Each structure stands twice: as C-alpha cells, then as structure tokens.
C-alpha cells in the first residue's frame, strides 16, 4: 500500500518539485515523434497506425501545466513476438538467440532465457530481436503475470504473450520514468483485460495506455525521489519482519513456560 501511494503521488506531480525553467513536456513529445517518423521512413522500425488522440473525458486527474497527457505508442514503438513451431527441430536445436516468454517478466531485469532459438526461426517466423533496454509488458500468463513490467538486459526475441516497448535516442531518457508509471499502474492495466477464465491484455490496450508525462528534468527528479522512498520502504519492511520474528520467538518462549 505504501509503495503504491508513493507511485501514485509521483505520477500526479506531487512528489518532486516543479521548476518554471524546465522545458515543457510538449517539446519533448514533439522531438520524440519527429525522430520516430524518421526511423519509420528509414525502415528502422515498422510503420504502425497511431492510436487516437486523447479525448478530454479520458483524462483521469489533473496534472501540472508543463506536463502533457500522451498515449504510450505516441512516444515509443510497441510490438510483440510469436512462438516458432515446436515441431520444427531446426528452430530450436543449436539455437543461441534468447526467446523470452511472459513467465520471465517477474524479473526486473532479464539476463537469460530458458529457451534459445536459431536464426532460421527468427527469419521464418519474422521475429524481431529487441535490443537491451527494451521494456516488456506481460499480456497474459499464470497468477500475477499479466501486467508485469520487466526490462531486457540482453538482446532477445519474445513470444506473443509480451508487448515490447522500444526506445531510441530521443525517448531513451524517459524509459525509467515510463517503467515507474507502468509499474504503478499494474492493477489498472490488469483491470482492462478481456476474456473469461484467463483474461488477456493485447497490444492495442498497451498502446492506448495514458501517460502523464512531465518535463524531462522533472522526470529525473521523480525517479530519484521514488528510488529513495522505495529504499525506505525496504528498510521499514525489514524492520517489521524482524519485529514479527522477535515477537514470534517471545510468544513461543511464553507458551513453553506455560506448558512445561
């Protein structure tokens, strides 16, 4: 609860100071979208249809005047992967390319994959090898998996149960803040899933995710502040566990005295 409160305050502009000389977030978005357009033109990322602009009734709460509401796919490139046929041995035997599934998104940083695939699998299945630093959002999976956010610590391919959020020069500095926003919206992201016994997210829902974007300088202040507060949460939780353990031993000693 305490961690969630910290994250909510952070994305509402109530955790770090606002400075009038910070470049407005709208300028940052303009640069990101311009560079994204050039990357599409150069064939470095795929051309995708942008989700609609944000309607006023979608905005959940007010933000500071030099912030901007944007959709996730307006400031990143979002794609997914697939599963090479397991009946085709050439896709797996001797493979060296990591293939990441949603089960690994419980890790904050992914440095290894349980399964490796071959270059033939990548080519035949039109898989993308996403660069180190790509964020992953689990679209579906067992238990708490759906909605989890992780980061690739290695270049890797992914399966269809993950959305990959890709960064480039202009938007790379916003990655840590976006990770914070997505992590803080874990329950909300899970709530927009569709389906019956095992609800699923999909790429379009991830693309449409609303992001309250501060100026870049303020993003850095927010991330630093959240990191410091999360360390305090870690220390508090450790103390509470220690106190509970001591109390448990004390109760055990009293019971032993009573029954002996």
For each feature predicted by the language model, list its residue ranges.
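A short beta-sheet element
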Residues: 101-102, 112-114, 118-183, 195, ...
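Specificity-determining recognition surfaces
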Residues: 181-211
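Sequence-specific dsDNA recognition surfaces
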Residues: 53-58, 73-88, 103-132
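Catalytic cores of nucleotide-enabled group-transfer and carboxylate-activating enzymes in metabolic
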Residues: 63-74, 151, 165-180, 188, ...
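A generic secondary-structure signal for well-formed alpha-helical elements
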Residues: 6-10, 14, 36, 40, ...
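Extended, domain-scale alpha-helical bundle/helix-rich regions
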Residues: 1-58
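Non-catalytic DNA-recognition/assembly elements of restriction-modification systems
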Residues: 4-5, 14-15, 55-82, 208, ...
